[in-house]
UniProtKB/Swiss-Prot annotation:
Swiss-Prot/TrEMBL GO biological process terms: translation
Organism: Methanopyrus kandleri (strain AV19 / DSM 6324 / JCM 9639 / NBRC 100938)
Signal sequence bounds: none
SUPFAM superfamilies the UniProt entry points to: L30e-like
Protein name listed in UniProt: Large ribosomal subunit protein eL30
């Protein structure tokens, strides 16, 4: 999990990442994200909406096993982050790392 956290941080710093559930859903409706990450404690209603639009857009959803506060910490933010959309992972290998983790059965949606 430390590798995924390191990759999330690098993607936030060097890539194009949008934080927040409302923005994530808007981008999913447009089919723009390459990956969506949701915190384990993301409210069920929001998570269901994200999963619905992600399925329509054929975008993988990774469930981060920590809380939204933990995800905010990893992103370097002093607030909760229930979900985030990755448009470009920059210098990180976040998308490949998460896909590999999901194939191995680590917290897939």
């Amino acid at each position: 999990m430390q590798e995924i956290e390191r990759q999330i941080r690098m993607a936030v710093e060097t890539g194009d990442v949008v934080l927040g559930s409302n923005q994530t859903i808007k981008l999913l409706k447009l089919g723009k994200p390459k990956l969506v990450i949701v915190a384990a404690n993301c409210p069920a209603e929001i998570r269901e909406d994200i999963e619905y639009y992600a399925e329509l857009a054929d975008v993988p959803v990774f469930v981060y096993p920590g809380t939204s506060m933990d995800l905010g910490d990893v992103c370097g933010r002093p607030h909760v982050v229930a979900s985030m959309a990755v448009l470009d992972d920059g210098e990180s290998d976040l998308i490949a790392t998460v896909r590999k983790a999901m194939e191995e059965g680590a917290a897939p949606s």
